[in-house]
């Protein structure tokens, strides 16, 4: 890492995070002027107004220009989506348990007196609340499932970066002008053209700023850098990039611009090493210093950490630690099935090893063709302990997409958005994370409904749980589709849509079914706890008959605080096998019920003509979802977290080693989970020491690939180190750990999430 990159890192985290009202005020000012116009044009004009008037900056020593806010890591508001939670939490931002922000008293006043009164009863949230039935509201209030994405615009998507970089904005504007001439009444084309032209003007503002700064700069080297930024910006406003620096700059400008449009999570990076390779090679051919090109890439990686999302207190518990979702996958396959690993794949990992920050959320695609040098580079990066890169298995993901009707060429081009959500870059609107489904809560409801049922059998209970899962999936789909329609009618994203196939051919926004592939991704959470509970209940009550069903239910209601409660809990934990130990009897319960969940989910269509797709990953939602479930037959206390990850065993229950964990997960049909899965693994640093440790990890990754698991990720850290960080956070400000599908600064996590990471079983190879 160069001295410049070190200073950029330090500067990024030097100040307290603040909330900026600038986007909200500019958006609102435009909206007041466009009453009565079509929604998509109002949205486009509001975003264009922001691009014209928002304050811009180029920070000291930056090589890549473009900042969403002048102050680093500031949160921005979207009151047009949901103004109510913002009003409710204005006074809580600086002191809440997770993801704190400072906000001035004057900004609070402005929000209360100017912004909220305008958006009250005008927001997307008002529409959604007005459409939700009482039954759906009741299910969400008890957290049987959550309906997400009601407070921000659409993200969780990868735009067609090759189209942007290989054509350039000037050519894209010309193409859109033709569409407008051919269909002058099409509001989508009008909105997209308006925003493409506004993007050009916004980039030119940076060119002018860089020139002004250069004129006042007394340092010769910095003056030259600023003039180069100005030259690159003027080029990018009209022409396609020719060099790596130009490509990185246009890439970042567009990402920032899209943030203004939607203020969304996970505008992910896709297959960065594939579409950026020609520009990297061109710069090398032109004689650029490889060390400088690496510094450019490191600069870009640092920039990815400048964007943080302002979430509600509740949402911050589900998505703790700013999982911005700048996810990129490296390696993988070409469209004709060959290995796609290239020199930039290596450089992306090298640059990450230098910066070691939570973003970008890099992943590596493994397959039978992956070469040993790249696998060793991957293992070397994992060993650093930041949880990056995560690993995805082509041998599972490609067939999973084929099963969903995706072409073979497109399936081989898959990447990931957000945490682990599978997507086809530039062709998919997957509405990932639209809902999370609490499988253990459903079981708890069934247990309580059977109190006093002397005729209850295990098979009867299992059938009731299946039926109840099906019932609540129906309600989850209903709520998700209302939210989907809300985005269509209230929050279209025409600029984003202009970079998604086949929106231009159809003349429709992604929210209106314009994309080639239209999915709605929902997560089933708690499968490990569900199978552990049912296996123990079956043994204790129906086979061994040590307790009647009602007697066990009484112990659970009392949270094991009965005269025999602790003995009962000890037996439930210690006498009955748990998922994650390669025990068919309990693993098969997981496999059967997860398959049932998946098959029920995939029955349903969304308003865009696509289908719902199941996944199993938690982000950090296993903590809040566990808080609403009482004591359960796996020995879990009331309110205790659920198993982390998605397919991971419950904390402390994977007693037979890592190989057993992998074998348990391999018994689940990973190809059904086409919205993504997540498996957390924690290693002690000592087990990966030296060349031998790296080779063991590389061999382990090959075994993972052969076992046909979809995903795996790693923490490499001692629990003692994490406990010390809890006690002395000022000494561990740079400690990065894996949470669930993303990495975060350990000291920025709430204590409940920190404790969860500490308690995970540490394995050895």
Residue ranges and their predicted role:
Residues 203-211, 273-277:
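Extended amphipathic alpha-helical scaffold segments
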Residues 214-221:
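A conserved hydrophobic secondary-structure block that centers on an alpha-helix together
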Residues 2-189, 225-228, 232-765:
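Conserved catalytic cores of very large enzyme subunits
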């Amino acid at each position: 890492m160069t001295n410049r990159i070190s200073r950029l890192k330090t500067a990024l985290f030097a100040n307290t995070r603040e909330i900026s009202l600038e986007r909200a005020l500019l958006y609102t000012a435009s909206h007041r002027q466009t009453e009565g116009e079509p929604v998509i044009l109002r949205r486009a004009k509001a975003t264009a107004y922001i691009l014209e008037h928002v304050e811009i900056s180029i920070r000291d020593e930056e090589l890549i220009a473009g900042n969403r806010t002048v102050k680093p890591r500031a949160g921005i508001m979207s009151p047009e989506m949901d103004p109510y939670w913002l009003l409710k939490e204005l006074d809580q931002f600086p002191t809440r348990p997770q993801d704190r922000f400072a906000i001035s008293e004057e900004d609070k006043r402005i929000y209360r007196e100017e912004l909220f009164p305008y958006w009250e009863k005008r927001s997307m949230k008002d529409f959604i609340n007005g459409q939700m039935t009482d039954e759906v509201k009741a299910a969400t209030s008890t957290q049987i499932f959550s309906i997400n994405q009601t407070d921000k615009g659409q993200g969780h998507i990868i735009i067609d970066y090759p189209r942007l970089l290989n054509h350039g904005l000037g050519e894209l504007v010309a193409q859109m002008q033709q569409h407008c001439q051919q269909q002058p009444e099409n509001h989508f084309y009008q909105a997209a053209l308006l925003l493409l032209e506004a993007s050009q003007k916004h980039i030119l503002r940076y060119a002018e700023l860089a020139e002004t700064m250069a004129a006042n700069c007394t340092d010769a080297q910095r003056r030259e850098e600023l003039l180069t930024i100005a030259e690159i910006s003027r080029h990018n406003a009209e022409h396609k990039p020719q060099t790596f620096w130009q490509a990185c700059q246009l890439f970042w400008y567009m990402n920032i611009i899209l943030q203004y449009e939607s203020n969304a999570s996970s505008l992910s990076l896709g297959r960065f090493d594939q579409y950026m390779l020609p520009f990297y090679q061109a710069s090398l051919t032109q004689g650029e210093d490889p060390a400088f090109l690496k510094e450019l890439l490191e600069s870009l990686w640092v920039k990815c950490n400048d964007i943080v999302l302002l979430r509600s207190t509740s949402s911050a518990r589900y998505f703790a630690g700013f999982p911005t979702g700048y996810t990129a996958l490296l390696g993988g396959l070409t469209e004709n099935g060959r290995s796609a690993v290239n020199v930039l794949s290596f450089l992306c990992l090298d640059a990450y090893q230098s910066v070691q920050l939570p973003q970008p959320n890099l992943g590596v695609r493994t397959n039978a063709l992956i070469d040993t040098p790249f696998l060793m580079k991957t293992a070397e990066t994992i060993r650093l302990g930041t949880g990056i890169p995560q690993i995805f298995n082509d041998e599972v993901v490609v067939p999973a997409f084929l099963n969903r009707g995706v072409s073979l060429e497109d399936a081989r081009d898959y990447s990931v958005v957000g945490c682990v959500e599978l997507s086809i870059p530039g062709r998919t609107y997957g509405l990932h994370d639209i809902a999370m489904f609490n499988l253990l809560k459903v079981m708890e409801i069934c247990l309580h409904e059977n109190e006093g049922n002397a005729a209850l059998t295990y098979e009867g209970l299992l059938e009731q749980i299946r039926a109840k899962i099906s019932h609540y999936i129906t309600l989850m789909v209903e709520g998700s589709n209302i939210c989907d329609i809300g985005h269509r009618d209230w929050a279209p994203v025409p600029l984003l849509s202009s970079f998604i196939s086949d929106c231009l051919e159809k003349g429709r926004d992604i929210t209106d079914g314009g994309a080639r592939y239209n999915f709605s991704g929902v997560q089933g959470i708690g499968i490990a706890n569900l199978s552990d509970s049912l296996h123990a209940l079956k043994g204790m009550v129906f086979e061994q008959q040590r307790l009647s069903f009602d007697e066990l239910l009484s112990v659970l209601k009392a949270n094991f605080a009965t005269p025999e409660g602790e003995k009962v809990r000890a037996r439930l934990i210690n006498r009955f096998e748990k998922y994650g130990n390669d025990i068919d009897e309990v693993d098969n319960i997981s496999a059967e019920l997860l398959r049932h969940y998946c098959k029920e989910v995939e029955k349903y269509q969304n308003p865009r003509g696509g289908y719902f797709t199941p996944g199993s990953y938690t982000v950090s939602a296993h903590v809040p979802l566990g808080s609403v479930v009482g004591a359960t037959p796996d020995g879990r206390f009331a309110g205790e977290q659920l198993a982390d990850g998605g397919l991971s065993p419950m904390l402390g229950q994977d007693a037979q080693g890592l190989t057993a964990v992998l074998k348990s997960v391999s018994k689940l049909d990973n190809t059904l989970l086409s919205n993504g899965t997540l498996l957390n693994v924690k290693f002690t640093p000592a087990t990966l020491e030296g060349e031998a440790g790296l080779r063991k990890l590389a061999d382990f990754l090959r075994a993972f690939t052969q076992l046909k698991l979809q995903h795996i990720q790693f923490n490499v850290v001692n629990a003692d180190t994490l406990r010390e960080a809890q006690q002395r956070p000022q000494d561990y400000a740079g400690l990065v750990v894996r949470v669930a599908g993303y990495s975060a600064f350990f000291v920025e996590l709430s204590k409940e999430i920190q404790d969860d990471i500490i308690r995970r079983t540490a394995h050895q190879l």
